[in-house]
Amino acid sequence: MYPNRHRRASFCSQPRTYPRNSLIRQQSLFKRNVSKRRPFQTVKMVDDSMMKAQRIHENQYGPDFSLAHNTAVSTFISYPDIAKSLPNRTRSYIKLKRLRFKGIVKVERVHVEVNMDCSVPKTEGVFSLVIVVDRKPHLGPSGGLPTFDELFGARIHSHGNLAIVPSLKDRFYIRHVLKRVISVEKDTMMVDIEGVVALSSRRFNCWAGFKDLDIESRKGVYDNINKNALLVYYCWMSDTVSKASTFVSFDLDYIG
């Protein structure tokens, strides 16, 4: 790349001379090239300045997030709409920076089983919260999101290290896994959950894109996302007849 750098010696005893006219031509040519590039740089700076750092908040709770034992639920993180009120977005794309979540899981024993010695068995199980990036979002033939079993093979795999099935690795990848092993003798128990997921870094930027086919469809729902949707999977595995109810708040930091 630098052929003269590693030579032992390379000297020239006579000073180099350049015609005066050639220097003038080189200087004027350089100035013209610089002036041509300035308008492009100015336009790019103005375009980027219209996008600003924002945060969108979302709570996920209710009957749809109450899991019976050995079941799983799939959902998605809502993105901002094109709107005048904040938080919003001004383009058909946003830069995803960071996702924070915090909440509780309430584990309840549904039917109390009493043993011969009048003791109540423990409620033991594994609760998992998995955040997955969907590179090419689209609804399946059933009209719903991919299920836990379709993505990871089986719910029982939540006891070990989760992995995307080979046939779907080109479309999905796991971004974060939170797992809690729960053992409780009481009828109910509250478990705190919390985590931070970095989506972009100095070396890598994660951009989400939207279809925005018309004015009414410029929403942040899964059906309007065409690049890098964030999916959330909740799973509760237990041999005891029980249920796990979740209340989780998500804060998505983005530039849009």
UniProtKB/Swiss-Prot annotation:
Pfam families: Gemini_coat. Disulfide bonds: none annotated. A motif (Nuclear localization signal) lies at residues 81-96. The keyword DNA-binding applies. GO terms for cellular component: host cell; host cell cytoplasm; host cell nucleus; host cell plasma membrane; membrane; viral capsid. It is a peripheral membrane protein. Its main location: host cell. Keywords: DNA-binding, Host cell membrane, Host cytoplasm, Host membrane, Host nucleus, Host-virus interaction, Membrane, Transport, Viral movement protein. One of its GO terms (molecular function) is single-stranded DNA binding. It is found in: Host nucleus; Host cytoplasm; Host cell membrane. A motif (Bipartite nuclear localization signal) lies at residues 21-42. Residues 150-187 are annotated as: Interaction with Arabidopsis thaliana NSI protein. InterPro entries: Gemini_BR1, GV_A/BR1_coat. GO terms for biological process: DNA transport; transport of virus in host, cell to cell. Binds to single-stranded and double-stranded viral DNA. Interacts with the host nuclear shuttle interacting (NSI) protein. This interaction may allow NSP to recruit NSI monomers to the viral genome and thus regulate nuclear export of viral genome by NSP. Belongs to the begomovirus nuclear shuttle protein family. Binds to the genomic viral ssDNA, shuttles it into and out of the cell nucleus. Begomoviruses use 2 proteins to transport their DNA from cell to cell. The nuclear shuttle protein (NSP) shuttles it between nucleus and cytoplasm and the movement protein (MP) probably transports the DNA-NSP complex to the cell periphery and facilitates movement across the cell wall. This is Nuclear shuttle protein. It comes from Potato yellow mosaic virus (isolate Venezuela).
